[in-house]
Amino acid sequence: LNLRVAAQETRLAATVWDSTVMAMPASEEADDWISRYLGSSARFVHMDPDCQRMIDTGFARAGEEVSFADGFPMLLISQASLDGLNRRLAEPVGMLRFRPSLVVAGTTEHAEDGWRSIRIGSVRFDVVKPCARCVLTTVDPARGDLDPSGEPLRTLIG
């Protein structure tokens, strides 16, 4: 799907948790396509470049921004941590249950919990806080089914 940005000044309010920011619609064609695909009314939008959504300053430096991400623009997890969790589960789960942006291999289990930063090439990323344990981990992203046993969240918080 190729999306074109609407050549209009229209802005829409988009809410992520308790934060409302202005968003720019893509096009009616894109909205129709995603609505048909989902079987429900939906819209494609992108962040208004003139709008700012600040990251929680309890975990980041003042002035750091995020767009429509939950709290931070990236989520880091190690393969070793997932492998360790799967050893404790009756039915293993895939990495996509955690919707990571970066998956690191070759570490010990939970090594990433103590990292303050990582470097990929010349780019340095701050590791600011562990990810909050979220009910979304109980939803299979391929099927959209909720795990009736509450796993893997039950094991993670247990």
Tell where the protein language model's regions lie, with residue ranges:
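Metal-cofactor-dependent catalytic cores
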Residues: 1-158
